[in-house]
């Protein structure tokens, strides 16, 4: 049996049950990971899945990493032998096995004695308004509507706002100065609404907003739930390493970015310093997954597994191994220069 399959077979949650089934029903299972696109006109990467000996079982997969697809009358011979038990230890992901055995061994050794993001912080998604353009106002719009500034809260609407080390009050002032729609209409249940707000809610925009799925399924519809002021923000999708940006201006954020709340006694400065290490860059690649177009996606459940500032004893050979591993993972998601 042979299939062309999405490259998500190397990391997606649904790939785990599939490969468990394959290993329990076929004597031979091989996955050919193809780095260059099988279908160049599509954003989807594709790999090949081959299985033989139905009715048998296998204790390992064969993963063949090939640069480009070319027709052959049989699967490639060369490959990495991936024990099913070891695959399970990597959260049932094949992507880490694109790395060399030395890189995987070093990663496991360092990660075993290091802190992960989930040990020092909680990572979650931001709020969902149901109608972003209605609930986020420009300063000029709020003034025109007569909405008081104390009802508007500075908000990070997407990852483009995550620049530098911190979002500061100067950042928020720049949003105001450039009349950007980065101010959430933050209303609370039980508070009497000013006349200007009632008029805004009853405007055509408000009548349209309340019909959206999220709005019509909450009471009252105009109170956006789960609005928090985190210690930091983490980019959801990134080109290189995900950005970890301190929140020095008490901003809130939509679900286009992750919100990070530090555990008691933790310092965002120390966390950012550790976040910038090469090993943490590698960990983001290993624990995250490619989205397409060269992007790396980091779900909350993946983010908490990221190893923070893992030490490799500063040996040059290990440093080179980590750097090469980062480059390898980025090439496989088409981010590295010249990889397209």
List the predicted regions and their residue ranges.
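Signature of N6-adenine DNA methyltransferases within the class I
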Residues: 1-134
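Polybasic, glycine- and aromatic-enriched phosphate-binding surface used to engage nucleic acids
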Residues: 96-316, 320-336
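Acidic, carboxylate-rich catalytic segments that either coordinate divalent cations
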Residues: 339
């Amino acid at each position: 049996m042979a299939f062309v399959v999405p490259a998500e077979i190397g990391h997606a949650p649904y790939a785990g049950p599939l490969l468990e089934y394959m290993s329990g029903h076929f004597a031979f299972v091989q996955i050919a990971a193809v780095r260059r696109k099988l279908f160049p006109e599509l954003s989807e990467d594709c790999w090949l899945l081959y299985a033989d000996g139905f009715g048998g079982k296998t204790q390992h997969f064969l993963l063949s990493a090939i640069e480009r697809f070319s027709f052959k009358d049989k699967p490639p011979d060369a490959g990495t032998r991936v024990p099913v038990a070891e695959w399970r230890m990597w959260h049932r992901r094949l992507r880490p096995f694109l790395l060399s055995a030395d890189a995987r061994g070093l990663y496991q050794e360092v990660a075993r004695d290091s802190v992960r993001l989930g040990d020092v912080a909680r990572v979650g998604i931001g709020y969902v308004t149901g109608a972003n353009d209605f609930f986020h106002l420009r300063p000029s719009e709020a003034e025109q509507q007569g909405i008081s500034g104390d009802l508007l809260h500075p908000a990070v609407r997407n990852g483009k706002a995550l620049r530098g080390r911190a979002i500061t009050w100067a950042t928020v002032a720049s949003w105001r100065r450039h009349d950007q729609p980065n101010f959430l209409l933050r209303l609370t249940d039980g508070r009497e609404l000013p006349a200007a707000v009632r008029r805004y809610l009853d405007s055509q925009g408000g009548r349209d907003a309340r019909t959206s799925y999220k709005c019509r399924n909450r009471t009252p519809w105009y109170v956006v739930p789960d609005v928090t002021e985190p210690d930091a923000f983490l980019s959801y999708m990134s080109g290189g390493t995900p950005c970890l940006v301190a929140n020095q201006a008490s901003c809130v954020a939509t679900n286009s970015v992750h919100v990070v709340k530090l555990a008691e006694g933790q310092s965002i400065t120390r966390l950012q310093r550790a976040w910038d290490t090469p090993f943490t860059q590698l960990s983001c690649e290993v624990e995250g997954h490619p989205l397409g177009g060269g992007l790396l996606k980091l779900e909350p459940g993946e983010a908490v597994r990221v190893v923070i500032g893992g030490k490799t004893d500063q040996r040059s050979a290990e440093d080179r191994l980590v750097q090469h591993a980062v480059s390898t993972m980025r090439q496989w998601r088409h981010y590295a220069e010249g990889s397209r």
